[in-house]
C-alpha cells in the first residue's frame, strides 16, 4: 500500500479530502479531510525517518506543511489533480448558499451537485491506483457544504423532504459553477364561489396581442381585467411572498355562469415562496374581505403535489347541479313541461361538441346522462329549472339543442325554441352523488 500511495501522490497530487475519501468507507467518525491528512502524516513521518526526500517533496507539493518544513528547498503546493481545488473551497460555497437562503423560510434543505466527466474519471483512476473503492466527490461535496450551511443558518439538511434544493453545476466551469436554488412550491387547496357573472376562471390573454398589450385590451394584455385565479392568487401570493402562482381547478364554468353552493374544488400552486408558515384561516378571511363581492373561498388548507392530479380527476367524475333560467319561444303548458322534464331524468344525451366551443374542443359526440330535471318556477314562456348532470354535459345546449347537435334537448321535447338566459352551478357533487 505504501508504494501505491507514493504512486497516487506522484500521478494525482490529491488533496487531503480526495485522498481521504478514497478510504472513506474505512472507520467512522472521521471526516475525509482528516483521513487524508492522517495518511499523509504517516507517510511523512516514515519518509523523514528513512530519508525518502522524494516522498517528502510529493507530500509538500500536495499541501502537507509538516513535510515542507523538513525540506531545504520545498516545492510550492499545487492544486489537487482530482478535484482541481474545489474541495478546498467548501466554506466559500457554503457562504454563497447561506447568503442566498437567509431570507427564505424553510424547514429543511438539500445540496446537490453536477460534475464533469473529467473529475469522475480522475477519481476512478485514483481509486484504481490505490486498489480501493472510495466515496464519490458528489457525495463528499454535498455533505460538507450542507453541514456548513446547517451551522451558518441553524437549519437542518433534509434529503428526503427538503423545502429547498441547492444545486451547483461544475460542468461548465470548475472555477465558476452555475448555482441554482429550487424552492418547493406551496400548495393550498380549497373551494371557491364565484358570485358575479362576467369573471373568467383564469387569466384570459388578449387574442390580438397574446398578452403583450395593445389598444384592443387597453394595453393590459388581458381580455378581462380580473379572474377567479387572479383574485384569489394575488392575496395568497402576497401572503407567502411568492414569485408567481398556478391555478388548478376541478373543471370550469363559463364566464357568464356563477359558481354557488358548496363551491368548486381548486388547488393554488405558489411558486418560489419566501414564507411557508401562514395561517390559512386568516388568509381565507382576508380573501373574502377583499374580493368577497365577486369571489369567496372556503376550507383553505395546505395540500401537496398529488392534489393537483386529484382535482383534475375530480372534474372528470363529479356531477354538478345547475339552476337555469329558461326563455321559450312561446308559452309551454306547465303539465307538458313537467312531463318532459320527468322524461329527461335518467336520459342519456348525445351531444356533439357545441358550436361555441369548437375552436378549442375536438368535434365529437359525447354521451352524458341527466340524473334529475326539476321545475322550480313556471311563468308561461319562462321557467327556472334545476338539472343534475354528468360531468362534461353542456347545459346551455341541453336546453337549446344547438341546432340539433344535442339530442334530446328541452327545446326538441317541448317542440318550442328555448334558450338559457342565465345559469348557475349550485352544487358540486362527487361521483357517488354526495357533496365533495
Curated annotation (Swiss-Prot):
Gene3D superfamilies: 3.30.70.2510, 3.30.70.3190
Keywords: Isomerase, RNA-binding, tRNA processing
InterPro entries the UniProt entry points to: PsdUridine_synth_cat_dom_sf, Pus10, Pus10-like, Pus10-like_C, Pus10_THUMP_arc
EC number: 5.4.99.25
GO molecular function: tRNA binding; tRNA pseudouridine(55) synthase activity
Residues reported to bind substrate: 322, 394
Reactions that this protein is recorded to catalyse: uridine(54) in tRNA = pseudouridine(54) in tRNA; uridine(55) in tRNA = pseudouridine(55) in tRNA
GO biological process, one term: tRNA pseudouridine synthesis
Protein's UniProt keywords contain Calcium: no
Protein origin, superkingdom: Archaea
Biological role stated in the UniProt entry: Responsible for synthesis of pseudouridine from uracil-54 and uracil-55 in the psi GC loop of transfer RNAs.
Protein name listed in UniProt: tRNA pseudouridine synthase Pus10
Originating species: Methanopyrus kandleri (strain AV19 / DSM 6324 / JCM 9639 / NBRC 100938)
Amino acid at each position: 500500500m505504501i508504494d501505491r500511495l507514493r504512486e497516487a501522490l506522484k500521478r494525482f497530487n490529491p488533496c487531503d479530502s480526495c485522498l481521504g475519501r478514497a478510504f472513506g468507507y474505512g472507520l467512522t467518525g472521521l471526516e475525509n479531510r482528516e483521513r487524508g491528512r492522517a495518511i499523509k502524516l504517516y507517510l511523512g513521518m516514515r519518509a523523514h525517518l528513512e530519508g525518502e526526500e522524494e516522498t517528502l517533496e510529493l507530500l509538500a507539493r500536495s499541501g502537507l506543511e509538516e513535510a515542507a518544513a523538513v525540506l531545504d528547498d520545498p516545492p510550492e503546493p499545487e492544486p489537487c489533480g482530482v478535484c482541481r481545488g474545489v474541495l478546498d473551497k467548501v466554506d466559500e460555497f457554503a457562504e454563497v448558499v447561506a447568503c442566498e437562503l437567509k431570507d427564505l423560510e424553510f424547514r429543511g434543505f438539500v445540496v446537490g451537485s453536477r460534475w464533469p466527466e473529467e473529475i469522475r474519471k480522475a477519481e476512478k483512476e485514483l481509486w484504481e491506483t490505490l486498489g480501493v473503492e472510495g466515496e464519490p466527490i458528489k457525495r463528499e461535496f454535498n455533505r460538507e457544504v450542507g453541514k456548513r450551511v446547517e451551522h451558518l443558518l441553524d437549519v437542518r439538511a433534509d434529503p428526503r423532504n427538503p423545502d429547498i434544493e441547492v444545486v451547483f453545476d461544475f460542468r461548465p466551469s470548475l472555477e465558476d459553477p452555475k448555482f441554482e436554488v429550487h424552492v418547493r412550491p406551496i400548495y393550498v387547496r380549497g373551494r371557491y364561489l364565484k358570485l358575479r357573472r362576467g369573471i373568467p376562471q383564469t387569466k384570459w390573454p388578449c387574442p390580438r396581442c397574446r398578452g403583450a398589450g395593445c389598444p384592443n385590451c387597453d394595453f393590459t394584455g388581458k381580455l378581462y381585467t380580473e379572474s377567479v385565479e387572479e383574485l384569489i392568487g394575488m392575496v395568497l401570493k402576497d401572503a407567502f411572498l411568492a414569485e408567481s402562482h398556478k391555478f388548478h381547478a376541478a373543471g370550469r364554468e363559463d364566464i357568464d355562469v356563477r359558481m354557488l353552493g358548496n363551491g368548486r374544488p381548486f388547488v393554488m400552486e405558489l411558486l418560489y415562496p419566501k414564507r411557508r408558515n401562514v395561517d390559512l384561516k386568516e388568509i381565507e378571511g382576508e380573501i373574502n374581505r377583499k374580493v368577497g363581492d365577486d369571489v369567496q373561498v372556503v376550507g383553505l388548507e395546505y395540500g401537496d403535489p398529488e392534489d393537483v392530479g386529484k382535482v383534475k380527476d375530480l372534474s372528470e367524475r363529479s356531477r354538478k347541479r345547475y339552476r337555469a333560467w329558461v326563455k321559450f319561444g312561446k308559452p309551454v303548458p306547465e303539465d307538458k313541461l313537467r312531463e318532459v322534464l320527468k322524461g329527461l331524468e335518467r336520459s342519456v344525451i348525445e351531444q356533439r361538441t357545441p358550436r361555441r366551443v369548437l375552436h378549442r374542443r375536438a368535434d365529437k359526440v359525447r354521451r352524458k346522462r341527466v340524473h334529475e330535471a326539476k321545475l322550480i318556477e313556471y311563468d308561461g314562456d319562462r321557467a327556472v329549472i334545476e338539472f343534475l348532470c354528468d360531468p362534461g354535459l353542456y347545459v346551455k345546449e341541453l336546453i337549446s339543442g344547438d341546432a340539433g347537435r344535442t339530442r334530446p334537448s328541452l327545446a326538441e321535447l317541448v317542440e318550442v325554441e328555448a334558450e338559457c338566459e342565465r345559469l348557475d352551478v349550485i352544487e358540486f357533487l362527487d361521483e357517488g352523488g354526495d357533496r365533495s
